[in-house]
């Protein structure tokens, strides 16, 4: 997945393909597992950001490239979508601000403009760490080549179940 430029389509529209070199060539990541319950790839590791926050990445599923300084290019698969969504959220705890991360990862839309308007200048990694919130898994609700609906699952000790689900499209 690569950011899409589809500003006229509104907040709930599906992303349009981009014509950037990143999307046309280098982001063509080989898909080996299209299951909604994929096997963990042998190259899955954890990227470390500020204050020791970590999130999963895979050299084979994504991110496989850097585009404009951002981790990009994920397999068009359920696991690729989950890793892309997690990377988009956690990138703000790496070398980019929350606004920079949102600007890169969210498709151009009314929703993007609203998100950027309320984005903090800098995210607080200590707040995330102290809450005990960590990536724990994902659930695929719907998947096609061009659109995915998923729920990222986080451990969250203060919740009634110990987990928190974040739905995304």
Protein language model features and the residues they cover:
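Structured, amphipathic secondary-structure segments that form assembly/contact surfaces
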Residues: 97-169
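Core segments of small alpha/beta cavity-forming domains
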Residues: 48-120
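Small-side-chain structural scaffolding
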Residues: 11-13, 81-85, 148
């Amino acid at each position: 997945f690569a950011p899409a430029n589809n500003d006229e389509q509104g907040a709930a529209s599906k992303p349009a393909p981009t014509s950037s070199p990143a999307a046309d060539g280098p982001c063509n990541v080989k898909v080996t597992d299209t299951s909604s319950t994929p096997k963990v790839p042998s190259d899955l590791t954890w990227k470390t950001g500020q204050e020791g926050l970590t999130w999963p990445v895979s050299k084979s599923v994504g991110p496989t490239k850097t585009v404009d300084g951002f981790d990009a290019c994920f397999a068009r698969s359920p696991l690729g979508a989950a890793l892309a969504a997690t990377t988009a959220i956690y990138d703000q705890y790496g070398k980019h601000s929350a606004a920079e991360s949102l600007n890169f990862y969210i498709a151009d839309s009314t929703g993007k403009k609203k998100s950027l308007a309320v984005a903090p200048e800098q995210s607080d990694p200590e707040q995330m760490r102290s809450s005990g919130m960590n990536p724990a898994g994902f659930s695929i609700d719907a998947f096609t080549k061009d659109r995915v609906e998923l729920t990222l699952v986080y451990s969250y000790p203060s919740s009634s179940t110990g987990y928190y689900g974040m739905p995304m499209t």
